[in-house]
Regions:
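Sec-dependent N-terminal signal peptides
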Residues: 3-15
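Catalytic-site microenvironment of enzymes
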Residues: 4, 18-251
């Protein structure tokens, strides 16, 4: 409830001029020592950390201390049967099990303000489990970013029914980690930001991705696009759902 009213306050206090805004989430943090390289990126990048991983808790704590926004990268069952890793949610779990898993994972990753799904092409299609996930997130006053690993996702309807703040991933930046592949997606990010005003993109802590972003993130500012922590886009999303139409963009 407090988070909801905080977002309302942000909406009504939006300045009269705002730039196109982009949130970039770096997923899959926690297993590799090289993941720490994500902290070489600007602190407006959001880090999504896998629970119960060897380095996840330490990286989350260090990143928070350096001003990064932290999310929980919550493992969910996929259609292809790929192993979820510890803390995963599967379709054979009951309500108590799902809620307990979500709560424990949020506790494991310190300073997590929200969560997004790791895999989940099966689980996010199911109304009941996603409703339980959102109930748990609401209890912890956390937002959710739907990674959209299936077009049939029910995350949005579950979140809306409970008033859980939600965003949707609109672009994956690094399915192809060649320079050409990264450049293609980065140009698409800029184009989408100009067209839509706000974009949520997901990338991963691959060495190629980190190098590319370090070199190319300044292009956003040159294009009049502001890189922001993910939660900064929630008020705009809420305003659109409530029928409000901000007339200008944040500087």
């Amino acid at each position: 409830v407090r988070l909801f009213y905080f977002l309302i306050l942000l909406v009504v206090s939006l300045p009269t001029a705002y730039a196109a805004q982009v949130a970039i989430i770096i997923d899959d943090i926690g297993y590799r020592q090289s993941d720490i390289a994500a902290l070489s990126l600007p602190s407006n990048i959001t880090l999504s950390v896998l629970p119960y991983t060897p380095l996840g808790k330490d990286i989350a704590s260090k990143a928070h201390g350096e001003g990064y926004e932290i999310m929980l990268h919550l493992p969910m069952q996929a259609l292809n049967g790929k192993k979820m890793g510890p803390g995963g949610l599967s379709n054979d779990m009951n309500e108590q099990e799902v809620k307990q898993k979500v709560s424990q994972a949020l506790i494991d990753i310190p300073y997590a303000k929200g969560a997004n799904n790791h895999m989940g092409s099966l689980l996010t299609q199911l109304n009941e489990p996603m409703y339980w996930v959102m109930e748990s997130l609401k209890q912890h006053q956390a937002y959710f970013v739907d990674s959209v690993t299936t077009r049939y996702t029910k995350a949005g309807s579950a979140a809306d029914s409970l008033g859980v703040p939600l965003l949707r991933r609109q672009l994956f930046l690094d399915n192809d980690t060649t320079h050409q592949g990264l450049e293609k997606q980065f140009k698409k990010l800029i184009e989408m930001a100009h067209q839509k005003g706000e974009v949520v993109a997901i990338a991963h802590p691959y060495p190629e991705t980190i190098r590319f972003l370090k070199s190319n993130l300044p292009r956003l500012q040159a294009q009049g696009i502001k890189l922001v922590p993910t939660s900064r886009l929630l008020p705009i999303s809420l305003a659109k759902k409530e029928g409000a139409s901000p007339t200008a963009r944040l500087k």
